[in-house]
């Protein structure tokens, strides 16, 4: 296994990508209907894995339509919020958690940027309506605040 992903369908999601400081307010990115993708890469992951991940995640039928049928985020059409989530790689040890299996920060950042870029490319090439669809993403390596409105506890774990 080289990557772990959690998918959560959403009605609206808002992610703080820069905390407030003395000189500026917090910065946020947000999406409307679509999917939140939490992603963690493990040691040994390479860029070769990214196309398969993006194809699977954007085409899997996990989004519920108005009629109650399930479709992909591409066919919905919906937006995607990508959240780097290194804690998905944690393993319990005693009363704490260890993250020794996670990829190094520099390598992880490169894979994350490639993943985001390919998601953006796939979503933009699949515009099939006038509905605004977009890919937004969090900041790799930083703590972030997430606000999420979901249409049911509909969360899936996928490993690649």
Curated annotation (Swiss-Prot):
Localisation per UniProt entry: Cytoplasm
InterPro entries (UniProt xref): Daa-tRNA_deacyls_DTD, DTD-like_sf
Catalytic activity, reaction form: a D-aminoacyl-tRNA + H2O = a tRNA + a D-alpha-amino acid + H(+); glycyl-tRNA(Ala) + H2O = tRNA(Ala) + glycine + H(+); D-tyrosyl-tRNA(Tyr) + H2O = D-tyrosine + tRNA(Tyr); L-alanyl-tRNA(Thr) + H2O = tRNA(Thr) + L-alanine + H(+)
Keyword field contains Hydrolase: yes
Gene3D superfamilies, alphabetized: D-tyrosyl-tRNA(Tyr) deacylase (3.50.80.10)
Keywords: Cytoplasm, Hydrolase, RNA-binding, tRNA-binding
One protein family per Pfam: Tyr_Deacylase
Placement of sequence motif Gly-transPro motif, allows the protein to recognize chirality of D-amino acids: 152-153
GO cellular component: cytoplasm
Organism superkingdom: Eukaryota
Keyword Cytoplasm: yes
Enzyme Commission number(s) of this protein: 3.1.1.96
Main location per the UniProt record: cytoplasm
GO biological process, one term: aminoacyl-tRNA metabolism involved in translational fidelity
Molecular-function GO terms, alphabetical: Ala-tRNA(Thr) deacylase activity; D-tyrosyl-tRNA(Tyr) deacylase activity; tRNA binding
Function per UniProt: Deacylates mischarged D-aminoacyl-tRNAs. Also deacylates mischarged glycyl-tRNA(Ala), protecting cells against glycine mischarging by AlaRS. Probably acts by rejecting L-amino acids from its binding site rather than specific recognition of D-amino acids. Catalyzes the hydrolysis of D-tyrosyl-tRNA(Tyr), has no activity on correctly charged L-tyrosyl-tRNA(Tyr). By recycling D-aminoacyl-tRNA to D-amino acids and free tRNA molecules, this enzyme counteracts the toxicity associated with the formation of D-aminoacyl-tRNA entities in vivo and helps enforce protein L-homochirality.
Family: Belongs to the DTD family.
Comment text on domains: A Gly-transPro motif from one monomer fits into the active site of the other monomer to allow specific chiral rejection of most L-amino acids except L-Ala. The trans conformation of the motif is maintained by Arg-143.
Summary of subunit composition and partner proteins: Homodimer.
Name of the protein this chain belongs to: D-aminoacyl-tRNA deacylase 2
Lineage, opening ranks: Eukaryota, Metazoa, Chordata, Craniata, Vertebrata
